[in-house]
From Swiss-Prot:
This is Aspartyl/glutamyl-tRNA(Asn/Gln) amidotransferase subunit B. Allows the formation of correctly charged Asn-tRNA(Asn) or Gln-tRNA(Gln) through the transamidation of misacylated Asp-tRNA(Asn) or Glu-tRNA(Gln) in organisms which lack either or both of asparaginyl-tRNA or glutaminyl-tRNA synthetases. The reaction takes place in the presence of glutamine and ATP through an activated phospho-Asp-tRNA(Asn) or phospho-Glu-tRNA(Gln). SMART domains: GatB_Yqey. Residues 288-299 have a biased composition (Basic and acidic residues). InterPro entries: Asn/Gln-tRNA_amidoTrfase_suB/E (IPR017959), Asn/Gln-tRNA_Trfase_suB/E_cat (IPR006075), Asn/Gln_amidotransferase (IPR018027), Asn/Gln_tRNA_amidoTrase-B-like (IPR003789), GatB (IPR004413), GatB_Yqey_C_2 (IPR023168), Gln-tRNA_amidoTrfase_suB_CS (IPR017958), Gln_synth/guanido_kin_cat_dom (IPR014746). It comes from Corynebacterium diphtheriae (strain ATCC 700971 / NCTC 13129 / Biotype gravis). One of its GO terms (biological process) is translation. Its EC number is 6.3.5.-.
Length: 501
């Protein structure tokens, strides 16, 4: 039976009958200059198939050479995840055929990973701490990228042709695999989101990856299974592949819990398979049967020697670890005088790093918080994207805040300037100039608009002179309308008060 034959079980009913068990596999592309086993550039965005060589194309006789920086950064990630670092680890060949892997095998690590037995402590939305145990973090190379043409949803099923770009083939990856996450119950989707978010913050703080989920430099595979309440044995799992946002991680886990519960309730069986996440409605769709380790026929790569990590080198790397995110947050919270709830809101919104960068660019903490948590979070929600995927930088937000502080933009005009930047109309100053947004500084023009507004509203003038000074809002509104919102409200209020004195 297929998933499409089933409705979703109500979430509360799922939890009454089943316990969810999760396993999360996160792939992080390392921001090295070159690929993991050869010399081409590892930078994102080049012309298709321009960053390739005999190794990444799998040509006969091509021999891989390990990128030392990739190994160093893998150790750095392992240390930050409280992992044990193997003094000796090995690369293995993971054998399978797919067009995005020209060699017909992927260089990975199997039974001898570079880092193992760690944990990452995360904080849930209400401040509850949760420890996620890490099984392993291992090095491998990324695959190429396929673009399927002619299909209804951009996938291979129904496609009439596929384009292969091998630029990504061979880029260094660290795959971080959790141990089974049990006992989360109704909070399982939230735990998944919190963990992936915390991991993203961590690798960005380490400086080893930009962790752009929207660009594929960080991707999550979510394994989900259910077992009847009160039982111990794990159920059959599915693996939803290549999830590319925090919100999608949460939705995919929740959907699979509800889908699997309904399948089991109706007497069906869960098929061990990969699944695809559908951004349009938060559902998952059937992929391919899930292979076992035996299917990949792992064996040690004969072209690569063991990776030796002496304890002295590991300690040297440990000494280079930067201020880690949870320590940094505690410091920032103290410096900014934020309550625990306020700090959680910033973190949960994905706004903290953006706010810090905006402050570093010259804005005050309150100005930066106001823009990112209020206006820009709303814009991100409207667009259905993560906050850091918006087409505006912290430096641009700081520039808008500076123009407001200088009196060159009102708050309303500033929002229009931000809208222009988000729409791709240029940098802040270019948008302000092109849209003619700068506050009017012509005293004569503003005074004329005030005089006309007063003349058109004699009843308001009478009320003001009778002692009701709060009625000037209509006059200010008329002046702002006449100047297309470009007059300085403080200047307008001052002129009104002077003329009615």
């Amino acid at each position: 039976m297929t998933a499409a034959m089933y409705d979703l079980m109500d979430y509360d009913e799922v939890l009454e009958k089943f316990d969810p068990v999760m396993g999360l596999e996160v792939h992080v592309e390392l921001a090295t200059e070159t690929k993991m086993f050869s010399a081409p550039s590892a930078h994102f965005g080049a012309e298709p198939n321009s960053n390739v060589d005999p190794v990444s194309l799998g040509l006969p006789g091509a021999l891989p050479v390990v990128n030392a920086k990739g190994v160093e950064w893998a150790i750095k990630i392992g240390l930050a995840l409280n992992c044990k670092i193997a003094e000796s680890s090995r690369f293995a060949r993971k054998n399978y055929f797919y067009p995005d892997q020209p060699k017909n095998y992927q260089i990975s690590q199997y039974d001898e990973p570079i880092a193992y037995d760690g944990y990452l402590d995360v904080v849930l939305d209400d401040g509850t701490p949760w420890r996620v145990e890490i099984e392993r973090a291992h090095m491998e190379e990324d695959t190429g990228k396929l673009t399927h043409l002619g299909g209804a949803d951009g996938r291979i099923h129904g496609a009439t042709a596929s384009l292969v770009d091998c630029n990504r083939a061979g880029i260094p990856l660290i795959e971080i695999v959790t141990k089974p996450i049990e006992g989360a119950g109704e909070r399982a989707p939230e735990v998944a989101r919190a963990y992936v978010g915390a991991l993203r913050d961590l690798v960005k703080a380490l400086g080893v990856s930009d962790a752009r989920m929207d660009q594929g430099s960080m991707r999550c595979d979510a394994n989900v299974s259910l077992r009847p309440v009160g039982t111990v044995e794990f159920g059959t799992r599915t693996e939803t592949k290549n999830i590319n946002s925090l919100k999608s991680v949460e939705q995919a886990v929740r959907y699979e819990m509800q889908r699997q519960a309904q399948v089991l309730e109706d007497g069906g069986e869960i098929v061990q398979e990969t699944r695809h996440y559908q951004e349009t409605d938060g559902s998952t769709s059937k992929g391919r049967p899930k292979e076992t380790a035996e299917d990949y026929r792992y064996f040690n790569d004969p072209d690569l020697p063991p990776v030796i990590a002496p304890k002295e080198w590991v300690e040297e790397i440990r000494a280079t670890l930067p201020e880690l995110p949870w320590i940094r947050r505690a410091r920032i919270q103290k410096e900014w005088g934020l309550k625990d709830e306020e700090m959680r809101d910033l973190v949960n919104a994905g706004a903290l790093d953006l706010i810090v960068e905006t402050v570093e660019a010259g804005a005050s903490a309150s100005e930066a918080r106001s823009w990112w948590v209020a206006y820009l979070s709303q814009k991100a929600n409207e667009s259905g994207v993560e906050l850091d995927s918006l087409s505006i930088t912290p430096q641009q937000v700081a520039r808008v805040a500076a123009l407001v502080k200088e009196g060159k933009l009102t708050n309303k005009l500033a929002r229009q300037a931000v809208d222009g930047v988000l729409a791709g109309e240029g940098d802040v100053d270019e948008v302000v100039a092109a849209r003619g947004l700068e506050v009017v500084r012509d005293d004569g023009a503003i005074e004329k608009a005030v005089d006309e507004a007063l003349a058109a509203n004699p009843d308001i003038v009478e009320k003001y002179k009778a002692g009701n000074t709060k009625v000037t809002g209509a006059i200010v509104g008329a002046v702002m309308k006449a100047t297309r919102g470009k007059a300085d409200p403080a200047q307008v209020n001052k002129l009104i008060a002077e003329k009615l004195a």
